[in-house]
Amino acid sequence: MSGLKLTNVSYSVGEKHLLHEISFGQETKGITAILGPNGAGKSLLLSLIHGVIKPDMGLVTWNGVSAQKTKLSRGYVFQTPIVLRRSVRANLAYPLQITGKHCPATIDDMLKLSHLTPLADHPAASLSGGEAQRMAIARALITKPEVLLLDEPCSNLDPASTKLIEEMIRNFVADGGSVFISTHDLAQAKRLANVVLFIESGRLLEQGPADDFFAAPATQASRAYLRGDL
């Protein structure tokens, strides 16, 4: 992956300003955690980075090309996983079918990676929350994206499911992928991230190495957030 760049990005719904003139450049491979209190704009920022929505003002580019026009491959997993009314195997096959890349061996590899091989032919609707989320991540990975975007991937999941999902994320990064993850789980951000973006009330207040952010947050808002007071 080369560079992601946001330049003076703003987004509003009606009269409500949700993101305000956000600018940053990101070329570091690895895992970037987007942190901030409820309603800060984390999920919205993730959607803009992906390109599924366009900013009202400003530019979002990947390698100098707009997020809507770039050919950079990206996988996106929502907080509530989308489950098709078919088997787990068929859910994983779907992205390959629509891209004309159907490959049973690839599906088997993803079933193994997500620890879902024993459930391959079960209805996806019967999966637990953690299983469904692992399936959603595997489905996002199956077309071999360069970038993976995750919106609260471990929200309300048990520790065992969280551990398996973090293992999937680390494996993707070890293979050269880049991850942007929105999370409320500070412990998870510490475990995974090498870069942190901190936003509050739609404004980007901090960007930098995760170790620096957690050791010496630079703003009053980020200090309050880490104390649990925001």
Question: Where would I find each of the regions flagged by the language model?
Answer:
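H-loop/switch region of ABC-family ATPase nucleotide-binding domains
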Residues: 183-184
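Conserved ABC ATPase signature
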Residues: 123-127, 131
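Conserved ABC ATPase "signature" region
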Residues: 104-119
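Helix-to-loop junction immediately C-terminal to a conserved catalytic motif
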Residues: 50
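Catalytic Walker B motif of ABC-type/P-loop ATPase nucleotide-binding domains
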Residues: 148-151
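The feature captures the beta-strand-to-loop junction immediately N-terminal to the Walker
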Residues: 35-37
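Helix N-cap at the start of a conserved alpha-helix in ABC-type nucleotide-binding domains
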Residues: 159-161
